[in-house]
Amino acid sequence: MYTLLSGLYKYMFQKDEYCILILGLDNAGKTTFLEQSKTRFNKNYKGMSLSKITTTVGLNIGTVDVGKARLMFWDLGGQEELQSLWDKYYAECHGVIYVIDSTDEERLSESKEAFEKVVSSEALDGVPILVLANKQDVETCLSIPDIKTAFSDCTCKIGRRDCLTQACSALTGKGVREGIEWMVKCVVRNVHRPPRQRDIT
Amino acid sequence: MIEVVAELSRGPVFLAGEALECVVTVTNPLPPTATSASSEALAWASAQIHCQFHASESRVALPPPDSSQPDVQPDSQTVFLPHRGERGQCILSTPPKILFCDLRLDPGESKSYSYSEVLPTEGPPSFRGQSVKYVYKLTIGCQRVNSPITLLRVPLRVLVLTGLQDVHFPQDEAVAPSSPFLEEDDSGKKDSWLAELAGERLMAATSCRSLHLYNISDGRGKVGTFGIFKSVYRLGEDVVGTLNLGEGTVACLQFSVSLQTEERVQPEYQRRRGTGVAPSVSHVTHARHQESCLHTTRTSFSLPIPLCSTPGFCTAIVSLKWRLHFEFVTSREPGLVLLPPLEQPEPATWTGPEQGSRGSAFCTREN
């Protein structure tokens, strides 16, 4: 009887877990976005000073609960040398957030090339992609139409998966909640990538 | 299993502004013929230099923790944090440099990578004091996919020469090697140039010789004269001083002189308590000379400056100064010096001239 009640309790309150990759060039704001997300969606989370974020080598892990879903963020290092490791995480992920530095016009083509490799990978077929045009708090930043134009080569590769381009500022938090809520809707309804297997017993 | 070896080409002591060169060798140590031989894979390796600052809680009052929010995942084993698990806070670090990515090693195979980074000039020198510690390390992190990061730490010693921060490498190619027989490639030119300039500045600062005389007196009259030729020294040098006791009106039975450093916490960071105030100043004696000098008219002493000690410096939290500390045992009865005194000799303590009173020791300020 205890086992039945325990199982029922876990079944009613379990959260589906989804892994979300955060990709993009170095200094685009991936780790800042992760910190901002944790601050906004986790009530008890005491955020760190965003000015103390340094270059990521390896993997920042963060967990965010949104409704019945639990998002596990994997924030990967974006330096050029580290990008060859991204595809090792594709098979296990349910969503991709690609962060672009809207103020760095010089590296926009470099960012597009990295993005093209991401969406070209078969391991990410059907995986929703949220493109974040970050640093929109800066006055001189590129606008969403500018960025969409720069990335127009990649539209044919997106295919049938969900894709949204969202303006955001990870520093101020603008656009962060909307982006994540969109991602939650997409991963929940994506029947091709079920949530991570969890043992109920 | 993978073996990682880090080798510093010229030892662990550096001058701020110099380039640190390190060769990292990664080896799959299984012999090629081992029955269980298999290739090993590493996702990445990265290297970074950082300076860790630690303060004694009983002496130093740091700003409240609110203003310094915690590091992102300070104990994370998946992201490269060179100061993971260390006490104190990281106050300075260089950008991480990727040594390799996606490395596969067959049994018995080795690969070497070189790391080069200029040590920042805006940091403090290495220092292990009573109140604060500044510790530099080169940290190499390696990770397999889906495994924790393994850290290899190499302790460093960083010396800071005041005045070098403002010097920039000249843009023109007019800098010629000091010796016509030496040929240097471009990569080494800046380094040798900086070390050369530092050497020249040290030579200029520490070779100014002019005799400084100080009168030594106690309450009843003159004891003698202390003479010293320099106030700026290099590590490893000897502090040489002379004492002239022949013309004193007060007889000196014994004296001692100590070479000391004084570590002082800056006023705004001193720990204050209602009772039992912890000292904000502490002294360390590096060398001492003691001599019985009854009937001595002239003597001298030589105190070596240890190579492992820290030159004087000043940061926002702490300052270190060098000084000579004298103690004299004088006689009350000048006429009865041959007889044991009826009263205990009265020790008179007098602090001699501080080293580098015009600035820190080894400073390059002109006199």
Curated annotation (Swiss-Prot), chain A:
<feature type="binding site">
    <location>
        <begin position="75"/>
        <end position="79"/>
    </location>
    <ligand>
        <name>GTP</name>
    </ligand>
</feature>
<dbReference type="GO" id="GO:0043001">
    <property type="term" value="P:Golgi to plasma membrane protein transport"/>
</dbReference>
<dbReference type="InterPro" id="IPR005225">
    <property type="entry name" value="Small_GTP-bd"/>
</dbReference>
<dbReference type="GO" id="GO:0005829">
    <property type="term" value="C:cytosol"/>
</dbReference>
<dbReference type="GO" id="GO:0005794">
    <property type="term" value="C:Golgi apparatus"/>
</dbReference>
<dbReference type="InterPro" id="IPR027417">
    <property type="entry name" value="P-loop_NTPase"/>
</dbReference>
<comment type="function">
    <text>Trans-Golgi-associated GTPase that regulates protein sorting. Controls the targeting of ARL1 and its effector to the trans-Golgi. Required for the lipidation of chylomicrons in the intestine and required for VLDL lipidation in the liver.</text>
</comment>
<dbReference type="InterPro" id="IPR006689">
    <property type="entry name" value="Small_GTPase_ARF/SAR"/>
</dbReference>
<feature type="binding site">
    <location>
        <begin position="134"/>
        <end position="137"/>
    </location>
    <ligand>
        <name>GTP</name>
    </ligand>
</feature>
<dbReference type="GO" id="GO:0005525">
    <property type="term" value="F:GTP binding"/>
</dbReference>
<feature type="modified residue" description="N-acetylmethionine">
    <location>
        <position position="1"/>
    </location>
</feature>
<feature type="binding site">
    <location>
        <begin position="24"/>
        <end position="31"/>
    </location>
    <ligand>
        <name>GTP</name>
    </ligand>
</feature>
<keyword id="KW-0547">Nucleotide-binding</keyword>
<dbReference type="GO" id="GO:0003924">
    <property type="term" value="F:GTPase activity"/>
</dbReference>
<keyword id="KW-0333">Golgi apparatus</keyword>
<keyword id="KW-0342">GTP-binding</keyword>
<keyword id="KW-0007">Acetylation</keyword>
<dbReference type="GO" id="GO:0006886">
    <property type="term" value="P:intracellular protein transport"/>
</dbReference>
<dbReference type="GO" id="GO:0005802">
    <property type="term" value="C:trans-Golgi network"/>
</dbReference>
<protein>
    <recommendedName>
        <fullName>ADP-ribosylation factor-related protein 1</fullName>
    </recommendedName>
</protein>
<comment type="subunit">
    <text>Interacts with SYS1.</text>
</comment>
<dbReference type="GO" id="GO:0042147">
    <property type="term" value="P:retrograde transport, endosome to Golgi"/>
</dbReference>
<dbReference type="Pfam" id="PF00025">
    <property type="entry name" value="Arf"/>
</dbReference>
<comment type="similarity">
    <text>Belongs to the small GTPase superfamily. Arf family.</text>
</comment>
<dbReference type="GO" id="GO:0016020">
    <property type="term" value="C:membrane"/>
</dbReference>
<dbReference type="InterPro" id="IPR024156">
    <property type="entry name" value="Small_GTPase_ARF"/>
</dbReference>
<dbReference type="GO" id="GO:0007369">
    <property type="term" value="P:gastrulation"/>
</dbReference>
<dbReference type="GO" id="GO:0034067">
    <property type="term" value="P:protein localization to Golgi apparatus"/>
</dbReference>
